[in-house]
Regions:
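Generic structural marker for isolated residues within well-ordered, non-membrane alpha-helices
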Residues: 136, 186, 291
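C-terminal helical cap and adjacent loop that interface with cofactors, partners, or active-site loops
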Residues: 251-308
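N-terminal Rossmann-like NAD(P) cofactor-binding subdomain of oxidoreductases
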Residues: 1-178, 265-269, 304
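C-terminal substrate-binding/catalytic lobe of Rossmann-fold NAD(P)-dependent oxidoreductases
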Residues: 15-18, 22, 27-60, 155-276
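Short glycine-rich or small-residue beta-strand-to-loop segments that form or flank ligand, phosphate
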Residues: 6-9, 123, 213-215, 275-278
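Active-site catalytic microenvironments for nucleophilic, acid-base chemistry
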Residues: 138-142, 217, 293-300
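Secondary-structure boundary/capping motif
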Residues: 131, 223, 285-286
């Protein structure tokens, strides 16, 4: 169909891949032409008449034609696929692999929208890195010191391969800290914000939802009203960033298409701010953001298929 753009997903079995398929199905300008999964090969793709999952290796991908290829693969698995995709095809990589690379465009539209228009190689941001950057970006010029971030996510962030961080028995009535130093999303946020920061993630027994609490040292005293005004101004035209007068909770982010930012508090001396950001780790933290990036790369209205 000439008025629609074709999209293929490699790694469609995972939680993010499944959300991508659902969003593509509902998008008026996109057509899903293949969905790759070794485990689901031969099964019908939900919401698609006549389309079945296929096992697509890099050689197999070279035989397909699509305007966009989304790689929803584990870290380190995507480059053989990137190597067979021509320069005229948009590649959106969900993994960490290219988030620090200068020759890929970093896909956080609220901060880097103009670079994403017409881009052909897009590194989709990580879920924690998205929330962290949305929470810190309006304060970059005011920070004096190292912000400290506490992150909590539902266990879907650990993927579908069984392990300690998605084991329901271990997670029951529990909170699991992991990767206490040098988490990839910390490196990513540091790189693209241009700020040092410290971040520790934790897994929660909920399936989805993500929360980041940021403690931010400031170079001069600031009132709560000024703090809130910075965020109101920065995100006034951003439909996927909701500024809240309340303290966001993890459950508020679950199922939400964007990021909820709130909890604005200030220490008595006005030099330490607290900001909280909540999102759905599978949506704005992955699939929704990928759809924004696809739209921008193709010249489609950015929020088509997402809002309205």
């Amino acid at each position: 169909m000439s008025d629609r753009h074709t999209v293929g997903v490699v790694g469609a079995r995972g939680h993010t891949g499944a959300e991508l398929v659902r969003l593509i199905n509902d998008h008026p300008s996109l057509e899903l032409v293949f969905a790759g999964s070794r485990e689901l090969a031969g099964e019908a793709v939900p919401g698609q008449e006549g389309l079945r999952f296929e096992w697509i290796d890099p050689d197999g991908l070279a035989k397909w034609e699509a305007d966009v290829v989304v790689l929803a693969l584990p870290d380190g698995a995507g480059d053989p696929y990137v190597g067979v995709v021509g320069p005229g095809t948009v590649v959106v990589d969900i993994s960490f692999d290219h988030r620090l690379d200068d020759d890929w465009v970093y896909g956080l539209p609220e901060l880097f929208r103009e670079k994403l228009r017409g881009a052909s190689r897009i590194a989709n941001p990580g879920c924690y890195a998205t929330a962290a950057q949305i929470a810190l970006a309006p304060l970059v010029d005011a920070v004096d010191g190292v912000p400290a971030l506490f992150g909590v996510s539902g266990y879907s962030g650990a993927g579908t391969t069984p392990g300690p961080r998605n084991d329901p028995d271990r997670l029951a009535d529990n909170l699991i800290p992991y990767k206490l130093i040098d988490h990839n999303h910390e490196k990513e946020a540091v790189r693209h914000l241009g700020l040092p920061l410290r971040f520790i993630p934790h897994v929660h027994p909920a399936f989805r939802g993500l929360l980041v609490t940021a403690h931010v040292p400031l170079g001069r005293p600031m009132s709560v009203d000024e703090l809130r005004a910075r965020f109101d101004s920065a995100y006034a035209e951003e439909p996927l960033v909701e500024i809240s007068a309340e303290i966001p909770e993890l459950r508020d982010g679950a199922g939400h298409m964007g990021v909820i930012v709130g909890g604005f508090e200030m220490s008595a001396d006005g030099r330490n701010a607290v900001i909280i950001a909540a999102e759905d780790n599978l949506l704005k933290g992955a699939a929704v953001q990928a759809m924004q990036n696809i739209n921008l790369a193709l010249g489609v209205p950015e929020f088509e298929g997402l809002i309205g």
